[in-house]
Amino acid sequence: MSLPAHLQQTFSPEEIQFIVENEPIKIFPRITTRQKIRGDDRGTGNHTRWQLITTDDKALNNMVAMRSTEVVLWIALLLKQQSKCSIVAPQWLTTKELDRKIQYEKTHPDRFSELPWNWLVLARILFNKAKDDFHDPIHELRGKIQDLREIRQIKVLKGLKYLNESHLQLDNLSLLEINELRPFITEIMDKLREIHTASLTAGTENDEEEFNI
């Protein structure tokens, strides 16, 4: 069964979130799953050892409480929900770093600041599921993310004037930003391609008429 036309051109929000949740992120576990800690010959002592059922035994069953490790985001969210870890916010997701990105966007009207491909979706997920793991106030971070997004949207719209039938430069735009633009841009490029083809055809016909004369 084929998908509706509007779903053939873009990812659904659920598909984007699924992709983002399979990316790695750092956590501080609150449990220990490693069966033996190097240099620890005292057995389990007072430390409870957990055994997690998983296909990725290396990552999940090698954790030591309060030692940073890296797991995929969806696992981090499950552990967080059960109060078994704290999620480490990405370095770019602070008020200081976001201020730098906003300033860059304002001073470089023809370029976009370098941000992870999943920055918008990741920020939204962490704001909703791990707000207590941020050092900066959540309302400030939300505001700066919104400011950054609006500035970039304005720059994208201004950049559409350089659109032609074959090419549009979209360096440093995230998956969500491109996904939102894709149907609109695709339609415009199709129209431009039709106009370009028609003009070439008309030019060829004129050349043939001149040659026959």
Swiss-Prot record:
Gene Ontology BP terms: DNA-templated DNA replication; double-strand break repair via break-induced replication
Key word Ribosomal protein present: no
GO CC terms, sorted: CMG complex; DNA replication preinitiation complex; GINS complex; nuclear replication fork; nucleus
Main location: nucleus
Annotated keywords: DNA replication, Nucleus
Subcellular location: Nucleus
Keyword hit for Cell division: no
Alphabetized Pfam families for the sequence: PSF2_N, Sld5
Subunit note: Component of the GINS complex which is a heterotetramer of SLD5, PSF1, PSF2 and PSF3. Interacts with PSF1 and SLD5.
Family of the protein in this entry: Belongs to the GINS2/PSF2 family.
Official protein name in the record: DNA replication complex GINS protein PSF2
The species this protein was found in: Saccharomyces cerevisiae (strain ATCC 204508 / S288c)
Gene: PSF2
